[in-house]
UniProtKB/Swiss-Prot annotation:
Protein name, as recorded: Lysine--tRNA ligase
InterPro entries noted in UniProt: Aa-tRNA-synt_II, aa-tRNA-synth_II, aa-tRNA-synth_II/BPL/LPL, Lys-tRNA-ligase_II, Lys-tRNA-ligase_II_N, Lys-tRNA-synth_II_C, NA-bd_OB-fold, NA-bd_OB_tRNA
Cofactor: binding details: Binds 3 Mg(2+) ions per subunit.
Binding-site list for Mg(2+) 1: E398, E405
Known EC number: 6.1.1.6
Positions that bind Mg(2+) 2: E405
GO cellular component: cytosol
Gene Ontology annotations of biological process type: lysyl-tRNA aminoacylation
Organism ancestry: Bacteria, Bacillati, Mycoplasmatota, Mycoplasmoidales, Metamycoplasmataceae
């Protein structure tokens, strides 16, 4: 099947014949590694000099970049950091005239020339030699508007990055945030580790897994839904402070805060507890804000203050206030009645604890604008967590900001006997239709029998964290390549 080319594509393709006649390779390789410079370095170092001073200094530089505009003898190229103007004097370099006349927006070039300034005081490199490195055969998106179709932005992120400087800045900030997170944990004597993506057991979170099959072993595996269990095994092994940052996979819905594969950090610290995990989490968020020079954030018209101490509330107290019913003493019958009143979809295995959590998600989550730790979760929804003084609840907290959950932390359950009982309770829920319940992880139970020190642990969603600090509303805006439905299968 022949591909229909646009007029622009036909023109660009025809130029390949011209390059052949000129003995120019339109898809060149780098023969010699040069000490090239970035435009921002030139601007930082030489912007304060006058044109006359620069001319007398006789400075020559090599630059690489993509052509973003071409006007008369001036060519503007963009590198990773910034743009700079090149000047081509046709009279002095007739040998380059045909090459320059056949350049197009988007072409990637190598220029060598003398640094100077224009009459308006802008830095410019006067071209001495010029080389085409990569010919662009398709026209780039309009430089002023970029890609307008949001689906096309996600499907062709490379074009978005070329044409939209703001998108590029978002992903640079993402990289900086990840570096800051590593710096924080490394400086606090945590050891970064890597654990398997393929798992024998579904455990560590309430989520549906992706399944795969290993041919050589004739065995079914799941892609990990959390890193909690292997990291706790490393606590047992004697690594007192451990963290992992990596991809997690959950076979669930896609929306503005969920993507089937996403990045988290989980960290565990021996001889600590929930209080320490809340302290570490608050420190981390405030460190990132400080390093990014952010005191407040704007989100949907709300100003979020990251400098004040994070609030703390109790889940059951908040549900009791919202419903007008004391949920510490409510009967299951009354809880079911309230759930129906508030449009909660009931499931067979639901207890008062499950219903309290559902009502919290429905009535209260969206109201938590300022950073807030929600504590005191029901034991039914926290199978890996140490119980509180009231055994119906556990030592757990979730951090909410602007109505979204950003972190989940708790004092870790260390008893193999109690952990087995919790896993068995999860199996009972699974039998009643809870397809997000954990299996019994016998290997983990065996590991716990060798003794896990008292510990605190926490998981933070990196993508949501980046959304927060870049003030983005959709997780797709902070993922280079979000999961999308195949075009061919779209109806």
């Amino acid at each position: 099947m022949s591909i229909k080319l646009t007029e622009q594509e036909q023109i660009r393709l025809s130029k390949l014949d011209t390059y052949k006649k000129l003995n120019i390779n339109p898809f060149e390789k780098i023969e010699k590694n040069l000490n090239y410079v970035y435009s921002k370095d030139l601007k930082e170092k030489y912007s304060s000099y006058s044109k006359e001073e620069l001319e007398s200094m006789d400075l020559y530089f090599d630059l690489y970049g993509r052509i973003t505009s071409q006007r008369g003898p001036f060519i503007v190229i963009k590198d990773y950091f910034d743009k700079i103007q090149l000047y081509f004097n046709k009279k002095e370099h007739l040998d380059l005239a045909e090459l320059v006349s056949n350049l197009d927006l988007g072409d990637i070039i190598h220029a060598h020339g003398k640094l100077s300034k224009t009459n308006t005081g802008e830095l410019v490199v006067k071209i001495k030699t010029l080389k085409l490195l990569t010919k662009v055969l398709k026209p780039l998106p309009d430089k002023f508007h970029g890609l307008s179709d949001i689906e096309e932005i996600y499907r062709h992120r490379y074009l978005d990055l070329i044409s939209n400087e703001h998108s590029m800045e978002v992903f640079k900030k993402r990289s900086k945030i990840i570096s800051l997170i590593r710096k924080y944990f490394d400086s606090n004597m945590y050891l970064e580790v890597e654990t398997p993506f393929l798992s024998n057991y579904i455990s560590g979170a309430a989520a549906k897994p992706f399944k795969t099959f290993h041919n050589a072993l004739s065995q079914e595996f799941t892609l990990r839904i959390a890193t909690e269990i292997p990291l706790k095994k490393l606590l047992i092994g004697g690594i007192d402070r451990v963290y992992e940052m990596g991809r997690i996979f959950r076979n669930e819905g896609i929306d503005t805060t969920h993507n089937p594969e996403f990045t988290t950090i989980e960290f565990y610290e021996a001889y600590s507890n929930l209080e320490k995990m809340m302290q570490r989490t608050e420190e981390l968020f405030k460190l990132i804000a400080k390093e990014l020079n952010l005191k407040t954030l704007q989100n949907k018209g709300e100003e979020i203050n990251l400098e004040e101490p994070f609030k703390r509330v109790d889940m059951i107290d908040e549900v009791s206030k919202a419903t007008g019913v004391d949920f510490r003493n409510v009967t299951l019958e009354k809880a079911l009645e309230l759930a129906k009143e508030h449009g909660v979809k009931l499931k067979k295995y639901y207890t008062v604890g499950h219903i309290a959590n559902e009502l919290f998600e429905k009535l209260i989550e969206k109201t938590l604008v300022q950073p807030t730790f929600v504590m005191g979760h029901p034991i039914e929804i926290s199978p890996l967590t140490y119980e509180a003084s009231d055994p119906r609840y556990v030592e757990r907290a979730e951090l909410f900001i602007n109505g979204k959950e950003y972190a989940n932390m708790y004092t870790e359950l260390s008893s193999p006997i109690e952990q087995l009982k919790r896993f068995e309770d999860q199996l009972n829920e699974k039998a009643q239709g809870n397809d997000e319940s954990s299996d019994i992880d016998w290997d983990f139970i065996e590991a716990l029998k060798y003794g896990m020190p008292p510990a605190g642990g926490c998981g933070i969603g990196i993508d949501r964290l980046v959304m927060l600090f870049t003030e983005k509303e959709s997780i797709r805006d902070v993922l280079f390549f979000p999961t999308l439905k195949n075009k061919k299968s779209q109806g």
